[in-house]
Regions:
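Catalytic-site microenvironment of enzymes
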Residues: 1-237
Length: 237
C-alpha cells in the first residue's frame, strides 16, 4: 500500500511539473484586414441577433494609414517580445492581404489554442478630431456566454490598460464592458480588446505611425500581459 501511495505521489508530482513547464499561450488578434466583410453572424451562441463580420476599421486622419496595418505592426512587435519571454503565441493573421474572417472565427482560434489570454488589438476613430486616449474593452457578464470568463477578462483588462497607458502616455479612457461584441460572446477564454489611441486625432495618428510609439505600444501590451500571467515583465524591455 505504501508503495502504491508513493507511486501515486510521484506520478502526481510529475504531472504537476509537466503542467508547470508548459508555456502559456496568448492569442494575438490584430483587428480587421485589407477588406471589410459585410456578411453577418450571430453575436453569441444561439442568438437571433446578427452583426456584420467586420466593418473595416478606421484610418489615420493625417497619415492615411489603415487601422488594419497599424494593428498588425504592433501585433508583430508584441509577438517577438512575448516569445522572448517564453510565451507561446498564436496569431489570427500575420499579413494584411484579404477579406476579414469575422469575429466568430477569431474567437474560435483562441478557443482551439486554449489561450490564457485572447488579446485583440485595435485603434479607435471618431467624428470628433479632439477625441483621444487609450481604453480597453472586456465582455460584460452574460449567463451562458461570458460568465465563465468575465472575472478573468476584467482583471486582464485592468492590468493591460494600466501598462499600456503608462507606455504610450495617452489619456486614460479607462475600461468598458460590452454585451454585443461577437468576438467576446463566442470566446471561451479570457478576452480583452485594446484601443491603442485615436487615428482620427492628428497627434495620436502621427505618433502611432512611428516605430518608436509602435514599440512602446508593444512593450506596454507585453508588460500587462505578462503581469496578468504572473510572469516577470523584464523581457519586454
Amino acid at each position: 500500500m505504501r508503495r502504491l501511495v508513493l507511486l501515486a505521489l510521484v506520478v502526481g508530482l510529475g504531472a504537476a511539473a509537466a503542467r508547470a513547464g508548459t508555456p502559456p499561450t496568448v492569442v494575438i488578434d490584430p483587428g480587421h484586414d485589407l477588406r471589410a466583410n459585410l456578411a453577418t453572424e450571430p453575436i453569441g451562441p444561439g442568438s437571433s441577433v446578427r452583426k456584420i463580420l467586420d466593418g473595416g476599421g478606421t484610418r489615420g486622419v493625417v497619415t492615411g494609414i489603415p487601422e488594419a496595418d497599424l494593428n498588425l505592426a504592433v501585433a508583430l512587435r508584441l509577438r517577438r517580445l512575448l516569445r522572448r519571454a517564453g510565451v507561446r503565441v498564436v496569431m489570427t493573421r500575420t499579413t494584411t492581404s484579404g477579406t476579414s474572417m469575422g469575429n466568430i472565427a477569431r474567437a474560435e482560434i483562441a478557443n482551439r489554442a486554449h489561450a490564457a489570454l485572447f488579446l485583440r488589438i485595435h485603434a479607435d476613430g471618431s467624428a470628433d478630431p479632439s477625441a483621444d486616449g487609450t481604453h480597453t474593452l472586456y465582455p460584460a457578464l452574460q449567463k451562458g456566454w461570458t460568465d465563465d470568463i468575465y472575472a478573468r477578462s476584467r482583471r486582464a483588462a485592468r492590468i493591460v490598460q494600466a501598462a499600456l497607458v503608462r507606455a504610450l502616455g495617452f489619456p486614460d479612457r479607462g475600461l468598458q464592458e460590452h454585451t454585443d461584441f461577437t468576438g467576446f460572446n463566442w470566446s471561451n477564454v479570457p478576452v480583452i480588446l485594446v484601443e491603442l489611441g485615436f487615428m482620427t486625432n492628428p497627434t495620436e495618428d502621427r505618433l502611432l505611425a512611428t516605430d518608436r510609439y509602435r514599440q512602446r505600444a508593444a512593450q506596454g501590451l507585453c508588460r500587462g500581459t505578462l503581469r496578468y500571467l504572473g510572469r516577470s515583465p523584464t523581457a519586454c524591455g
